């Protein structure tokens, strides 16, 4: 709505120019070229004479004949006031005012401005001649007053009094912004035209039709200044006025030029966007038209690229050309010329054979030329309000016809317009009814009329959001003072008087109603097309009718002026109002179901949908009349308001029309929703939905990821389901352009099945509206269901499933049927449905004990798809079950009472509704059923291994399952359940996202050992393992065992009187989830453990200690204890936050725990199986059912969860066993050959550097006398076995230097040419790390040396020949080798013997026994790696002395002398080391990784979100046989070798935190599935993200007298294939991590304790060797320690009893470990699981735990 408000001039009356609730100003849509002087009638210079006799004063200047002039009125009659929206007023050229022209009948009192004070301002005087209309024009229009009942002025009387009636012109609006100036100029030009000044307006060429007079210039100047304030003028206008402030004509001329240019460009863009071609015109003409438009736009600076142009052209193709949309849309680089070649080909084919049909595509029905315009299309305003004006030869003044003339015209019945109407009803004037339509409502007392309004009609407005009328005559059920805010285009409020209904009665007897607002402050009665669309009525502007979506014509549309109108004759007066639904009387004698109850029962669907469903019997068991609908209209569901909050309505009508021609289940829409974050790993993160185009039947499937194979499985499932269940074949599937749909795998699958994929265009989500809206609707329902029920978020897909079942059964208001009915299925029986989250009690037919409660509290989710049962969530068991054995818990409406639904309770309604079903349940309760143990059809949510919050008030004390009193003996008060709601846990535990959550895996375990083991990684409880106990007392447990057995029989119950509930850390799967359970007292724990542990070893001794250190020998002094405690003191263990006590809910105390033997797994199946069972029962618990075990294991195969190893018994089939003729894998080559580096190298600079390196190498070879230069041998004379091929290799080093090396092909060397017993030794990495650690602690100088061409210093004993280098040009000759050339098998061993001999004899060094290439004397330690030497010494001069000796024999380079006291940087054997003596040492590989990783061609994400961990728990590798061709297999194996090779190099150097992932993935190098590659990429991505991490060492405390060498051990029991265990060890010297190892156990362990023993036994040999090395290099005493988090293992080590070892393998391993610990004086100590940093070696950990365990030693 546009309001003309002259706020800058308060003395001038305000007026309203037009009325609309759209933001479009009605006068701004005229073609800009229509305002030029060439289309305006020439100005008639004849003017009427001035009325010189009339005297005018400011008090009597109004013209009495015009009712809108403010005539003098009595004091008692106030002037009409309309606030900011006054009645319609006009502007007049009044000559009777000598002081100026009159505006709105008031005397001119325009204040003088600086412009008016200029000499160019000519105030009009009495003789001034203002423009007047010629007398032949006729009577000008005038608007009636509110008091007048006549609409038009009598023509005859007006003619007789021409001198007293003036022409009143609508003033232009005020300019309020520089951006609005172009639109404002249009209205200003129209104002000049209506003022008979059209002749002075500049034409297109900038010249007016006639010259402007001085008076006209004054008039033009004044009006421009008033309505265009200078502060709102654009800059270019101000620039013109700054030169000549009166040059208004130049401003108008430039404005018209801009309008013309913008119009041409806009027309071209509109034409291009609305192209249509079906072959009816020659293809050449169509091509010429399109190319001309594109060229014109490009020339004007609007670039249209080929992609956009092709999309626009293809969108307009129809008929035989339409298929080009689908055959060409995949060509990303398609050009317009290529597209027109296809169009020409089809056109020529049509001309040659019109009757033949193309055979290269499916021939769907041709798209109908439906020009129907929907109200919510992308251009509603252009279609509905402002269509393109038709050319009209009549002048503007033709509107002023006489009323009597129009009334004498013949008339016809306009209502006879039928569907075939194609010509618009064009009214040039409201009196010119050339179709004879009668104005039946001209006498209605409207408040306002505009001069271009068609009386008796409603203006159709596509942009208006609400319908507004000025008369209350047609408003039904009106209510006053509505709280509604309506604003116009300028965001100004429009006061609303009332709201009601506007009722229509159309010509086909259709009755409907819409909401209407009443306000007198508008110029038109507006009918909103948006509100008509809501009642299934659309406006077709090609037929000019209102019609329903099925094409039924309801009423004609009349075009008058620029707008379209519909007659008010179809409105029903308010005196025949029909009673509304609110007036329906409800009988008190009949109890009806309350609507809020039904609303919640049916998944919170809206009232209209529910009523349609009941009316059409898609919901059975009760009728529409059984529901109380009195509150349906005004009812607001709080859960719906929260869960279904949305932005705006979805745009309708976006699908292609031809889709309607498909049969049921032939055209599917699909889309993927997700991910949902912060959920357990067992819960799905995505779901994929499918919708049938014809029936609107919906399917949803859960997904854990969006990988290709996951999507392919779902597609295979649904296609098979449709084929078998509905005997239909899917032809087309519409989907978006996500990578999960556009991948090659799915494309081949669809192509193989003959299915056409239909993709949406880029960024065009509207074209995918069916699937997008379904996902949004289901998500709204999901949020609402979870909000209402209070269930945890990990059950979100159950809410989706419930909503899908219900919505498939609800009728569509449009089709009057449900999706199930369309699909030919029976309706949904609501008596079998429960509200989502309805509290129930599930029967446990097989409890642990006969005295245990038989009922388990649960929450109903949705009907089962695989049985007649119901899927119910059991929080206490953390699982869902499919069962019919449940009872509805009365009085529990979940969260329904939280919002105060008028204190409604639905117990009685629910009982009546499910009465028949209760009888069915009761009749089956006596049967022994196993359906409680049948998993849901969604196994991803079964057996959720987590500890979420216990349900708040899961059972009130009145219904406590521990109460032994029968229900019949309770009092009446006790029978009624407490009003406190039973509600599911609101959320999962906060740490659940970091936990190892998986379906439980049932494995057979040995009962004798299942409970003594405290943990696989620390244990479930803190056990009373005796600490610091003498070995001599280890047998005393036998005497106490019998006495304690009896006590334990009574300790199974968890009553508060017997148990102290305190916080005890629970080892989650993998020992990573910090939760608490009620702790049992020390004495009670000991009783239970000893009683339940007829174990492999003796039970612990009785006496306890507060220490956590268990020595192998009996400690007799305090000093020994302090020594053992000091072992842990300086280790880089994580600091754990203090645990705050947590009070557990009453239900946990009241309900006895239902125990499980479940185990969890994580990445690689790596988790703990040590679920601690507290009740010894021979009966299997609810979770131990065999059926459940089978389903749970099958779940691993169907979940598509990414992981490393599935712990299942199915034998793994690697591809290497199935693929034949895989001879070898090409080695990884990082160097260049001679031809690559020199011959064909196009990089001139690099080529020159390689040539230089080549000559340098040749010179070095000659200098070292590498071969015999005295004689050349003929090839035929030498034994071929002794001829070694040679070659030059080139590479570029990290420091930028280019190097060449002449090498022998040792890979094809004959075995007879070398001694296989010789060894080529290099320094062990542990020796280097040990030396570096000791150097830091002892302030050593570190010197780095390099011996050039080291191998060439070693003589060769064998007779070998090689071909000469290429530069010699002797290809047929051979030369004999004299030195150990690089590449020969024996060269390394020869060099080692040579340098070893020199160091011992000439340098006074000796080699450390057991550690090759480590040499020492009293002052210096040397680590040798081929030609690199690292020297360590406390005296730098000692190092220099060694260097001097080496230079006497070898070409020795000093890389880094290490003499600075500041930080020194080294590059030692790939490690980038930062060393400051006496302070710290940092080891990393940032520069190396920055250079190498990008060369691996791994899809890195350098700017995206960085990974926080190298993997995540709960992921499994699918071991199904891989189908792949041989070439692709070799390529992928080669890629895996490169990736894992680099990762191994980095991991074993210093990134010990990655060793578990590297070790697991390395086992799959020969199984390069897509999943394995993805996980390898993820590992490389993590290495890239953390390439700046360093291994941090700090100098040991100087007060420490001894060196401390510690091995920390851990094991994950049975988490590898074939139930092998993963073991890991970390080695620390003086608190610095120097090494780590992660590997799979060589034998199958049968318990957690056995796995821990195996891990410790693997660490002992290396620990002893390192101990010897440390003692050799540093003469300090050494303390050795073994740390483990398994107290049962410690108990075995300190025990002397071996009678209960169950087998000899375990026994021998344990006995050997006892001997090693005892003989090597090892201190075995206990470490808490949460602090066990070796945990990272055995399993994937959550992000939080991974960081906690590693942030102290690597960061």
Curated annotation (Swiss-Prot):
Top-level lineage group: Eukaryota
GO biological process: DNA integration; DNA recombination; proteolysis; transposition; viral translational frameshifting
Disulfide bridges in this chain: none
Low complexity compositional bias, start-end: 153-165, 402-418, 960-969
Region of interest (RNA-binding), residue spans: 299-401
Active site: 461 (for protease activity)
Gene Ontology cellular component terms for the protein in this record: cytoplasm; nucleus
Pfam family, one: TYA
Chain coiled-coil ranges: none
Region of interest (Integrase-type zinc finger-like), residue spans: 583-640
Post-translational modification: Initially, virus-like particles (VLPs) are composed of the structural unprocessed proteins Gag and Gag-Pol, and also contain the host initiator methionine tRNA (tRNA(i)-Met) which serves as a primer for minus-strand DNA synthesis, and a dimer of genomic Ty RNA. Processing of the polyproteins occurs within the particle and proceeds by an ordered pathway, called maturation. First, the protease (PR) is released by autocatalytic cleavage of the Gag-Pol polyprotein yielding capsid protein p45 and a Pol-p154 precursor protein.
PROSITE patterns per UniProt: ASP_PROTEASE (PS00141), INTEGRASE (PS50994)
Residue span(s) of domain Integrase catalytic: 660-835
Binding site for Mg(2+) 3: 1610, 1652, 1685
Biased composition (Basic and acidic residues): 1038-1053
Chain location of the short sequence motif Bipartite nuclear localization signal per the record: 1178-1212
InterPro entries according to UniProt: Aspartic_peptidase_AS, DNA/RNA_pol_sf, Integrase_cat-core, Retrotran_Ty1/copia-like, RNaseH-like_sf, RNaseH_sf, RVT_2, TYA
CDD domains: RNase_HI_RT_Ty1
Region (Disordered), start-end ranges: 1-93, 126-173, 352-421, 956-1087, 1092-1111, 1130-1187
RNase H Ty1/copia-type domain sequence ranges: 1610-1752
UniProt cross-references to PANTHER family, sorted A to Z: TRANSPOSASE, PUTATIVE-RELATED, TRANSPOSON TY4-P GAG-POL POLYPROTEIN
Domain notes: The C-terminal RNA-binding region of CA is sufficient for all its nucleocapsid-like chaperone activities. Integrase core domain contains the D-x(n)-D-x(35)-E motif, named for the phylogenetically conserved glutamic acid and aspartic acid residues and the invariant 35 amino acid spacing between the second and third acidic residues. Each acidic residue of the D,D(35)E motif is independently essential for the 3'-processing and strand transfer activities of purified integrase protein.
Protein name from the UniProt record: Transposon Ty1-DR5 Gag-Pol polyprotein
């Amino acid at each position: 709505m546009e309001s003309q408000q002259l706020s800058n001039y308060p003395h001038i009356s305000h007026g309203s120019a037009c009325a609309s609730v759209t933001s479009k100003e009605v006068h701004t849509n005229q073609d800009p070229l229509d305002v030029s002087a060439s289309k305006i009638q020439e100005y008639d210079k004849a003017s009427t004479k001035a009325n010189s006799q009339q005297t005018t004063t400011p008090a009597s200047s109004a013209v009495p004949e015009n009712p809108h002039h403010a005539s003098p009125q009595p004091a008692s009659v106030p002037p009409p006031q309309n606030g900011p929206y006054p009645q319609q007023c006009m502007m007049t050229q009044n000559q009777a005012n000598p002081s100026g022209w009159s505006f709105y009948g008031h005397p001119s009192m325009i204040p003088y401005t600086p412009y008016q004070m200029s000499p160019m301002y000519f105030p009009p005087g009495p003789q001034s001649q203002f423009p007047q209309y010629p007398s032949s024009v006729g009577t000008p229009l005038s608007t009636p007053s509110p008091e007048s009942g006549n609409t038009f002025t009598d023509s005859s009387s007006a003619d007789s009094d021409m001198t007293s009636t003036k022409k009143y012109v609508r003033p232009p609006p005020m300019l309020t912004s520089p951006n609005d100036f172009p639109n404002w100029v249009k209205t200003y030009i129209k104002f000049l035209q209506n003022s008979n000044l059209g002749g002075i307006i500049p034409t297109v060429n900038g010249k007016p039709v006639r010259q402007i007079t001085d008076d006209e210039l004054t008039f033009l100047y004044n009006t421009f200044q008033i309505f265009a304030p200078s502060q709102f003028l654009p800059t270019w206008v101000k620039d013109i006025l700054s030169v000549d402030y009166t040059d208004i004509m130049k401003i108008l001329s430039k404005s018209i030029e801009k309008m013309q240019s913008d119009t041409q460009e806009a027309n071209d863009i509109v034409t291009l966007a609305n192209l249509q071609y079906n072959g009816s015109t020659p293809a050449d003409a169509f091509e010429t038209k399109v190319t001309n438009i594109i060229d014109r736009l490009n020339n004007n600076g609007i670039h249209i690229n080929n992609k956009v142009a092709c999309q626009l052209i293809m969108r307009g193709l129809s008929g035989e050309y339409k298929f080009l949309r689908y055959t060409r849309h995949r060509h990303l680089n398609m050009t317009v010329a290529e597209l027109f070649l296809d169009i020409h080909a089809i056109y020529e084919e049509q001309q040659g054979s019109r009757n033949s049909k193309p055979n290269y595509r499916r021939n769907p029905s041709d798209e109908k030329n439906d020009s129907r315009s929907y109200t919510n299309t992308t251009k509603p305003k252009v279609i509905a309000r402002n269509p393109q004006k038709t050319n009209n030869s009549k002048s503007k003044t033709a509107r002023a016809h006489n009323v009597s003339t129009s009334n004498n015209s013949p008339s016809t019945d306009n209502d006879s317009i039928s569907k075939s109407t194609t010509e618009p009803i064009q009214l040039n004037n409201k009196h010119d009814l050339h179709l004879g339509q009668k104005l039946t409502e001209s006498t209605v007392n409207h408040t306002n009329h505009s001069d271009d309004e068609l009386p008796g009609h409603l203006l159709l407005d596509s942009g208006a959001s609400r319908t507004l009328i000025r008369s209350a005559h047609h408003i039904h059920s009106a209510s006053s003072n509505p709280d509604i805010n309506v604003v116009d285009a300028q965001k100004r409020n429009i006061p609303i008087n009332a709201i009601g209904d506007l009722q229509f009665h159309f010509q086909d007897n259709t009755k409907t109603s819409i909401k209407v607002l009443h306000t007198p402050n508008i110029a038109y009665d507006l009918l909103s097309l948006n509100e008509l669309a809501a009642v299934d009525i659309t406006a077709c502007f090609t037929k000019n009718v209102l019609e329903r979506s099925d094409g039924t014509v309801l009423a004609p549309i009349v075009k008058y002026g620029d707008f379209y109108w519909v007659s008010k004759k179809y409105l029903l007066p308010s005196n025949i109002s029909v009673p509304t639904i609110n007036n329906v009387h409800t009988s008190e004698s009949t109890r009806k179901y309350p609507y809020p109850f039904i609303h919640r029962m049916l998944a919170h669907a809206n009232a209209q949908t529910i009523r349609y469903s009941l009316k059409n019997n898609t919901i059975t068991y009760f009728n529409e009349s059984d529901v109380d609908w009195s509150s349906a209209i005004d009812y607001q569901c709080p859960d719906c308001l929260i869960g279904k909050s949305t932005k705006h309505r979805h745009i309708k009508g976006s699908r292609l029309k031809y889709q309607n021609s498909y049969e049921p289940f032939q055209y599917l829409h699909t889309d993927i929703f997700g991910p949902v974050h912060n959920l357990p790993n067992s819960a799905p993160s995505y779901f994929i939905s499918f919708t049938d185009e014809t029936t609107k039947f919906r399917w949803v499937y859960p997904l854990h990821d969006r990988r290709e194979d996951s999507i392919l499985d779902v597609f295979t499932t649904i296609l098979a389901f449709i084929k078998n269940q509905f005997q239909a074949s899917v032809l087309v599937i519409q989907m978006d352009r996500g990578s999960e749909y556009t991948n090659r795998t799915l494309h081949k699958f669809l192509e193989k099945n003959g299915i056409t994929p239909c993709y949406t265009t880029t960024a065009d989500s509207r074209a995918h509206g069916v699937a997008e809206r379904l996902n949004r609707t289901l998500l709204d329902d999901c949020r609402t269901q979870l909000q209402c029920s209070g269930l945890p978020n990990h059950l979100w897909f159950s809410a989706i499933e419930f909503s899908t079942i219900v919505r498939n059964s609800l009728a569509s208001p449009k089709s009057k049927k449900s999706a199930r009915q369309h699909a030919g299925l029976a309706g949904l029986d609501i008596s079998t449905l429960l509200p989502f989250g309805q509290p129930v009690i599930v029967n446990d037919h097989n409890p642990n004990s006969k005295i245990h409660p038989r009922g388990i509290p649960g929450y109903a989710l949705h009907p089962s798809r695989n049985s007649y049962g119901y899927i119910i969530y059991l929080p206490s068991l953390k699982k869902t079950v499919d069962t019919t054995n449940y009872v509805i818990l009365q009085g529990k409406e979940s969260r329904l009472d939280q919002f105060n639904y008028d204190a409604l309770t639905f117990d009685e309604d629910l009982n009546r509704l499910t009465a028949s079903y209760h009888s069915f349940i009761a009749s089956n309760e006596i049967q022994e059923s196993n359906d409680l143990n049948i998993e849901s059809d969604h196994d991803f949510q079964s057996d959720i291994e987590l500890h979420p919050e216990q349900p708040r008030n899961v059972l009130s004390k009145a219904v406590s399952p521990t109460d032994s009193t029968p229900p019949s003996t309770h009092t009446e008060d006790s029978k009624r359940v407490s009003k406190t709601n039973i509600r599911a846990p609101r959320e999962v535990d906060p740490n659940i996202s970091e936990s190892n959550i998986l379906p439980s895996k049932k494995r057979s375990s040995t009962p004798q050992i299942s409970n003594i083991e405290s943990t696989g990684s620390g244990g479930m409880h803190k056990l009373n393992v005796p600490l610091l106990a003498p070995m001599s007392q280890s047998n005393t447990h036998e005497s106490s065992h019998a006495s304690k057995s009896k006590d334990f029989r009574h300790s199974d119950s968890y009553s508060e009187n017997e148990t102290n509930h305190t916080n005890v850390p629970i080892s989650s799967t993998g020992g990573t989830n910090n939760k608490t359970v009620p702790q049992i007292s020390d004495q009670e724990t000991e009783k239970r453990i000893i009683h339940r542990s007829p174990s492999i070893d003796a039970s612990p001794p009785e006496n306890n200690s507060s220490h956590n250190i268990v020595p192998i020998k009996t400690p007799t002094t305090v000093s020994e204890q302090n020594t053992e405690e000091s072992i842990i003191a300086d280790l880089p263990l994580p600091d754990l936050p203090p645990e705050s006590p947590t009070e557990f809910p009453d239900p946990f105390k009241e309900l006895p725990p239902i125990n499980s033997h479940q185990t969890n797994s994580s990445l690689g199946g790596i988790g703990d199986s040590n679920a601690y069972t507290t009740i010894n029962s021979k009966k299997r618990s609810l979770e131990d059912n065999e059926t459940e075990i089978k389903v749970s294991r099958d779940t691993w195969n169907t979940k598509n969860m990414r992981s490393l190893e599935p712990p299942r018994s199915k034998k793994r089939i690697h591809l290497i066993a199935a693929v034949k003729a895989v001879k070898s894998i090409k080695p990884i080559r990082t160097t260049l050959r001679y031809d690559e580096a020199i011959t064909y190298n196009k990089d001139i600079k690099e080529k020159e550097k390689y040539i230089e390196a080549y000559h340098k190498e040749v010179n070095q070879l000659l200098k070292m006398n590498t071969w015999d230069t005295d004689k050349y041998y003929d090839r035929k004379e030498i034994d071929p076995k002794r001829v070694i091929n040679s070659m030059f290799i080139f590479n570029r080093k990290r420091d930028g230097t280019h190097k060449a090396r002449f090498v022998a092909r040792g890979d094809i060397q004959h075995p007879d040419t070398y001694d296989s017993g010789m060894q080529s030794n290099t320094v062990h990495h542990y020796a280097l790390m040990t030396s570096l650690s000791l150097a830091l602690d002892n302030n050593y100088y570190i010197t780095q040396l390099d011996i050039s061409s080291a191998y060439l210093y070693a003589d060769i004993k064998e007779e070998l020949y090689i071909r000469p280098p290429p530069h010699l040009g002797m290809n047929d000759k051979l030369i004999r080798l004299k030195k150990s050339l690089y590449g020969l098998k024996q060269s390394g061993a020869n060099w080692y013997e040579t340098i070893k001999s020199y160091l011992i004899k000439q340098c006074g060094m000796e080699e450390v026994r057991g550690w090759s290439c480590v040499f020492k004397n009293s002052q210096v330690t040397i680590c040798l790696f081929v030609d690199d030497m690292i020297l360590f010494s406390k005296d730098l001069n000692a190092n220099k002395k060694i260097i001097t000796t080496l230079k006497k024999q070898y070409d020795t380079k000093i890389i880094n002398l290490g003499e600075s006291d500041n930080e020194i940087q080294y590059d030692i054997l790939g490690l980038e080391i930062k060393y400051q003596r006496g302070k710290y040492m940092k080891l990393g590989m940032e520069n190396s990784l920055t250079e190498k990783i990008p060369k691996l061609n791994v899809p890195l994400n350098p700017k995206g979100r960085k990974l926080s961990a190298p993997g995540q728990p709960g992921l499994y590798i699918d071991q199904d046989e891989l189908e792949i061709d041989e070439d692709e297999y070799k390529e992928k194996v080669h890629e895996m070798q490169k990736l894992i090779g680099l990762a191994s190099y980095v991991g074993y150097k210093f990134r010990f935190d990655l060793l578990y992932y590297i070790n697991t993935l390395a086992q799959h190098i020969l199984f390069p599935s897509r999943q394995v590659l993805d996980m390898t990429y993820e590992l490389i991505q993590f290495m890239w993200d953390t390439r700046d991490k360093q291994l941090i060492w700090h100098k040991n405390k100087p007060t420490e007298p001894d060196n401390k060498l510690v091995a920390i051990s851990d094991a994950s029991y049975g988490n590898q294939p074939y139930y092998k265990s993963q073991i890991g060890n970390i080695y620390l010297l003086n608190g610095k991590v120097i090494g780590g190892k992660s590997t799979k156990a060589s034998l199958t362990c049968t318990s957690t304790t056995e796995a821990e023993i195996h891990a410790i036994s693997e660490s002992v040999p290396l620990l002893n060797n390192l101990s010897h090395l440390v003692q050799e290099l540093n003469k300090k005493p050494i303390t050795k320690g073994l740390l483990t988090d398994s107290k049962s293992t410690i108990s075995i080590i300190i025990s002397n009893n071996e009678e209960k070892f169950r087998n000899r393998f375990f026994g021998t391993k344990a006995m050997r470990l006892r001997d090693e610990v005892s003989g090597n004086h090892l201190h075995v100590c206990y470490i808490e699981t949460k602090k066990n940093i070796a945990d990272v070696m055995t399993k994937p950990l959550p992000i939080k735990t991974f960081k906690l365990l590693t942030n102290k030693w690597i960061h």
